[in-house]
Amino acid sequence: MWMFKQDSLITALEIGTSKVVAIVAELNESEALNIIGFGQAPSQGVIKGQIVDRKLAYEAIRKAVKAAELKSDLELHQVYLGVTGQHITSSNYTGSHAIASLDRCITDEDIDDVMSNARRFNLAQGQHMIHVIRQQFMVDGQRMINSPVGLSGSDLGVVLHAVQGYKDDLHAPVQLLRRMKLEAENIAFNGLASALAVLSPAQKAEGALVIDLGGGTTDFAICSRGVVCHSGVLAVGGDHVTQDLATGLGCPFKRAEDLKIKFGSAIVSEAARGQVREITNESGIMDRRVNVENLHRIMAERLKEIFAIIAAEMDRCDVADMAQLVVLCGGGAYIPEICTLAGKVLELPVQIGAAVNLHGPSTIIERPEYATALGLLKFGAFDMVRQREASSKIIPLKQRLKNLLRIDH
């Protein structure tokens, strides 16, 4: 067994609709993450990102975790757990605080007070707060990203982005992990994790929309000026594209999935018009013909709808002008011409995302379908160093790590 310090190990666990992924990494003294273990298993008992059959889900999680343990030659005890599902919502909240000191100089205590005021929002019954992310401060109405401590003013304001979900849905995977003698060290919304994985500091500053096209859900997050300004979940993903094909082409779901992978496209190209493919059965005998143009049209309609919903949400929340770039990840990023369609609907340049500032096999860190799990490693590193800092009181380190996505909770 490799000799790693337990307090330097981070395990990410993503329980998706199509797959369960566990990745183990070591956080070294220079705060670099090195991947040392990987496990994956087909998902079972999960629909639209939420566990519906605990027995099946337990077995899928167990297989992925055991594979990661075997690869890393470690016995795992804690994980950073990714969560998604349509029960997850987000909102922005504001708080204000009058500066009481005679010299009107803003102190750390003023920061604590205004943050406390902004957090005084009411959650719906049964909801649990997942993240509270500081977006910006305001001093006498003037917006600023960095800490205003030391500045003078009469009124201090803050804007927070909060992500919340329902306790029962969040606790379901945690309970399964405990049956395996695993503890959830912390949980993170998958959409934020994916953004952590694939965005560079410059992209976060300039503004980017990250869309993770999963099997059962599509998670998204918008970063601008270095912070998350909006996020959300659509209960629509790649499986819905497959179901549309199964219905439209009159074939079983599994056959539709094969056709999507082999012949799919997000746009209807000229080359596809009138094209017909002969499809063989398991015995190698041709049993049907498929109109490729029709296949592409069915896929394009569903994918266009997904991007259009996100565009409408951005307009509704007045954040459309904050993104200068779209980064796609998740398994859906492999669909041919997906960038072309996304760019047309969202009217922005589009690229496929790959993890940044991680060390490990290229077969893992460069694959868009692992963005969430890789982002969970970064979230875990942020959380781990924050805990170390809390005991050692190293203020500069704390401030530096808070800038990761300015997650205050």
Q: What label would you give each PLM region?
A:
Residues 237, 241, 334, 369-375:
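Catalytic-loop motifs flanking and including active-site residues across diverse enzymes
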Residues 308-326, 335-353, 383-385:
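ATP-binding/phosphotransfer module of carbohydrate and carboxylate kinases, centering on a glycine-rich
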Residues 1-19, 23-210, 227-229, 238, ...:
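Nucleotide/phosphate-binding catalytic cleft detector across ATP-hydrolyzing
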Residues 81-86, 324-334:
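Glycine-rich beta-strand-to-loop/alpha-helix junction loops that act as flexible
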Residues 14, 212, 233, 330-331:
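Small/polar loops that bind or transfer phosphate-bearing groups
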Residues 224:
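A cytosolic small-molecule/anion-sensing beta-strand core signal
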Residues 219-221:
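A structural feature that tracks compact, well-ordered secondary-structure segments
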